[in-house]
Amino acid sequence: MRLNTLSPAPGRVSAKKRVGRGIGSGLGKTAGRGHKGLKSRSGGSVKPGFEGGQMPLQKRLPKFGFTSRISRVTAEVRLAELNKVEADIIDIEALRAADLIDNNIKRAKVFLSGELTKAVTIKGLMVTKGAKAAIEAAGGKIEE
């Protein structure tokens, strides 16, 4: 057996339909598209969300919510990720240097996820209650 001798099982593959090739083919003249109408035409398709002129669902429902501008410049940092930071005092600049946050981030919040293996000093970052307890348990402290 070689790759060039392989072929599908008999009856497995059928020839593609050649539309518009006479009455006898069953797909002549209108090529299976029916008579007139949008879907019979070239490029004719109903756009997603179009409901035949009725007001579409996405326009019937009310708008809601907004994107907080503060959340765009705020990052969340896991407690376990602080182990990657080599600085003794961890602040925004130290997090940037460790590649934990992007350059556009101006505020960061440390939350309890994972374990802290070394004593660190947190300066100028927001900290959750659980993270604060874990940092102090590891011998670290939090400065405002």
From Swiss-Prot:
Any single Pfam family the record assigns to this protein: Ribosomal_L27A
Positions of region (Disordered): 1-54
Database matches in Gene3D superfamilies: 3.100.10.10
GO molecular function, one term: rRNA binding
The organism's place on the tree of life at top rank: Bacteria
Assigned keywords, A-Z: Ribonucleoprotein, Ribosomal protein, RNA-binding, rRNA-binding
One Gene Ontology cellular component: cytosolic large ribosomal subunit
Gly residues bias spans: 21-31
GO biological process terms, semicolon-separated: translation
Physiological role: Binds to the 23S rRNA.
Subunit and interaction comment: Part of the 50S ribosomal subunit.
Protein family per UniProt: Belongs to the universal ribosomal protein uL15 family.
NCBIfam families the UniProt entry points to: rplO_bact
Name of the molecule in the record: Large ribosomal subunit protein uL15
Provenance organism: Saccharophagus degradans (strain 2-40 / ATCC 43961 / DSM 17024)
Organism lineage string: Bacteria, Pseudomonadati, Pseudomonadota, Gammaproteobacteria, Cellvibrionales
